[in-house]
Amino acid sequence: MTDTTSKTTAIQLLRAYHDNIQNPDEAAALFADDGVVELPTVKARAQGREAIRGLVQGLLKKIPGFRFKNTQVWIETPDKVFAEYSVEALVPDTGKIYKQTYAGVLIAEGGRIKLLREALDTAEAARAFSKD
């Protein structure tokens, strides 16, 4: 399990989440016991480490090469960070490239992620996953 302490900042947690997105166990371990990932624009929500692990596993099944890159931090405090970051990866089921920019806010509490809320372009997601 990933070692975090109460001194771990929000930006450190966001970077660790991005660095570990290919490892669902490590990504989920960054969250508080009752931590939440929300993607309101696609009506997705996972609460608790097991649910978050499952969300990441499901994502990687659909987009095996999913990795965050080009993180631009806009607002940063010790317990909150707002950033934009991108993903560009193949969707094997459609043969299309999933090219997306996310806007995310992360709230840290006790050295863990309490909330990660992300927004994304739903039209781009629909295009990448459409089989036409």
Language-model region placement:
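Short, mixed-charge, low-aromatic patches
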Residues: 7-16, 39-45, 59-64, 82-86
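A beta-strand edge to alpha-helix "cap/lid" segment located at domain peripheries
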Residues: 2-5, 60-132
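Short, low-complexity N-terminal intrinsically disordered segments enriched in polar/charged residues
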Residues: 1-29, 33, 132
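Hydrophobic pocket/interface hotspot
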Residues: 17, 26-28, 35, 48, ...
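A solvent-exposed, acidic/Ser-Thr-rich amphipathic alpha-helical stretch
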Residues: 24, 28-77
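Residues at secondary-structure transition points
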Residues: 4-8, 46-50, 97
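Hydrophobic alpha-helical core bundles mediating ligand binding, dimerization, or RNAP-core interactions
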Residues: 14, 18-21, 31, 56, ...
